Amino acid sequence: AVALPATLLRQILSSLAGEWVHLSAGGSGMAHITDGTTHFDLAVVPPDDFPKPLHPASPSLQTRLPAGNLAEAIRRVLHAASKEDNRPNIAGVRLIIAPGGATAVATDGARLAIATLPAEEADAQEPYAFTIPSKTASDLATLLDAENTVLLTASQEVAEFEASLRLSTRTLPHPYPAWSDVVQRASENPTRITAPAATILSAVKLAALTAGSEVRTATLNIRSEVRAVTLDIRERNVTLSSETPELGRSTVPLEATVDGPPARVHLNSTYLVQALTACREAVVTIAVGTPNTPVLVQVQDGIYTEVIAPIRTVSQGADT
């Protein structure tokens, strides 16, 4: 057995023109790679220096899941995972395996994304949850694209996903924040608009053109890199707008079904765009409460949900 530098090996294999590649290694400490015309001799890594494969010890869960559905669920929520080094407990995707189904969750504290997938093959006796790092989750989604099912074996320390390839990862050991109550509260928002995700997405992108790259926050009175849009809901009239001194303002009408009292909320346009993009081509309901209440974005079949915290403006801070 030999070990080779992974990045260099990938670069070589992706660049060679031949359909077949011959790889050989002897006792010289070198590995020879050729496609018949181009030749490489690579220094091998001592096998004993290669990390030992991870395996779940005394696994608490072993079940099969539909690989494509799991990959899609991970992709939908991954954008919401925290990218801050000081929040390791949410720097990944939370997977909850339950009898008959599974759920993928990600949050960065300002938004929460949830994707569910039916999985009749799942034979978990009770819900079992663990969190995998974001990079691992991204790699896993790519690996599962060409698979039918994946065998998941997990303990609280290690999760292993096995199909034609096997991926093992350490799980994030830190406690994951409670999130189901956040969704429940947002689902009780009294004002709702319903429209195709693509229609809302187009209006948000258009309104955000005058949002600039900064807004002034009310609580700290400092600048942060946030592009804000305002969602204004009336009885028969829905608009998206933004305004900045350096760019001007925009008002974009949105054709949507309205149910509930008038409402107005300021949202991070990047978050809203990413949430609507994750909804794919589905019909979406956006539920709005007070200006300070998190907003619910949900596809009609409930398979994808995102909750987004609103932005408090300077005028709101002055009024409180």
Predicted features along the sequence, with ranges:
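Structural preference for solvent-exposed beta-strand-turn elements
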Residues: 1-320
